[in-house]
Each structure stands twice: as structure tokens, then as C-alpha cells.
Design a protein with these regions (language model features):
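Conserved AMP-binding/adenylate-forming
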Residues: 32, 54-57, 71-115, 194-199
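Short secondary-structure boundary/capping elements
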Residues: 35, 62-69, 90, 94, ...
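A generic structural signal for well-ordered alpha-helical segments
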Residues: 43-44, 102, 121
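Short loop/turn segments at beta->alpha junctions
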Residues: 59, 116-117, 172
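Conserved ATP-dependent adenylate/AMP-binding module captured primarily in the ANL superfamily
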Residues: 99, 109-133, 179-196
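ANL superfamily adenylate-forming
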Residues: 123-185
Length: 199
């Protein structure tokens, strides 16, 4: 008896595609309360070996591991869920990794712009202010890249406060996801397009 030749890779791709709702992949809608960090986890299921930062060369999996290291480091220095954390101006891509580490523990990132540190402490309760002189890679590398979040924020919870235009503007995880999606549509960006970002 002759059996037909099946392309298992193609079958798996078709099954995965059938599980998508529009451009939302299964991992993104199966997590009860998706957030920015949930999307990074989802990217690693399908694109773990894709290079997302050219210099230094960092893949999706490397980025995720740096986030995990950073989350463990942040906990070790006393950062708590929902606590605002001022993001220092670090060498690229350390600030970008730091913000995801902040979100991974359920804390809130603060872009201070030109606002003085003392003004931040008067406007935000219990803000953690990190030094501009740290090297995140050196600080976090001694910590495990396994991190189990004790708190996962809901979409409506604060993710980012920005003082770059004066008064603080508060953005939730939902706001960030919607804004990113709107930018993607406005610029007609296709899936897997690489963009340079330097916080």
C-alpha cells in the first residue's frame, strides 16, 4: 500500500495558522492577561533564533533571557510590583532590556526626560531611581535567566509614565499595545520588519 507524502512542517504551519485570530498568534490570546512581557514570551515560541538586535548580536531568546536576568536583579535590589522605576539613560540596548525587565516583575517604567530626580520623588510615591552609571549586562549577568513572575499585570494597569513632554503621561499595557499596532498600520510595516529604537 502506498502512503501519500506529507510535509509535516507545512501541516504544522497550517495548524498554527488556523489557530490564529487575525494576526494574533495563539500564545498571545491564550495567556489570561496579556501584557508586553507576554508578547515577548510568545515571540520566543516561534522566533527564538531570529536576530532582533544586530550590534550587539541578540536573538529573541537572548533578549528574553536578559529580561529574566534583569527581573531577578531588580527583585534583588528591592523593586516591587506596581512600583515606578526611573529608567536611566544606558548604553543601547540596555534601557530597552531594562524596561521589559521592569514589566516582567509587574512594575512601572518611568521615562524621566529632563525632569530632575528630586522632582520625580515628589510626584511619584516610592519611585526606584537607578543610577545612570550602571552597566545592566554586568549587574544582571550573575542572576538566573529563569524567572517566575509573582505578579502579572492586567492590560489596563500602568506600564509606563513619561515626563518627556512635561507633565507625566500614564500609559497602560493596553495603551502601549494599541499605540504600537496603530504605528504599525500607519507606517504599513509588515511582520518581521526590524526597526531601530533607542530609549
Amino acid at each position: 500500500m502506498n502512503y501519500p507524502d506529507f510535509d509535516l512542517q507545512k501541516i504544522n504551519e497550517n495548524i498554527y495558522s488556523a489557530q490564529c485570530i487575525g494576526n494574533v498568534e495563539p500564545i498571545e490570546f491564550m495567556i489570561p492577561y496579556p501584557s508586553m512581557s507576554a508578547l515577548i514570551e510568545g515571540q520566543n515560541i516561534k522566533y527564538s533564533n531570529q536576530t532582533i538586535i544586530a550590534k550587539p548580536k541578540i536573538t529573541n531568546l537572548d533578549f528574553f533571557n536578559y529580561i529574566q536576568n534583569t527581573a531577578n536583579w531588580l527583585e534583588s535590589i528591592g523593586v516591587k510590583p506596581r512600583q515606578p522605576v526611573a529608567i536611566p539613560k544606558l548604553e543601547y540596548p540596555q534601557s530597552e532590556i531594562l524596561i521589559y525587565g521592569i514589566w516582567q516583575i509587574g512594575a512601572v517604567g518611568v521615562l524621566r526626560g529632563h525632569t530632575a530626580k528630586k522632582n520625580l520623588t515628589s510626584q511619584l510615591n516610592e519611585i526606584a531611581i537607578l543610577s545612570d552609571d550602571i552597566n545592566l549586562f554586568d549587574e544582571a549577568k550573575q542572576f538566573s535567566n529563569k524567572y517566575n513572575p509573582k505578579y502579572k499585570p492586567n492590560l489596563g494597569e500602568e506600564a509606563l509614565i513619561t515626563f518627556e513632554t512635561g507633565d507625566g503621561i500614564k500609559l497602560s499595557h493596553y495603551n502601549l499595545l494599541v499605540n504600537a499596532n496603530s504605528i504599525q498600520k500607519a507606517l504599513n510595516l509588515k511582520s518581521r520588519t526590524k526597526i531601530y529604537c533607542n530609549i
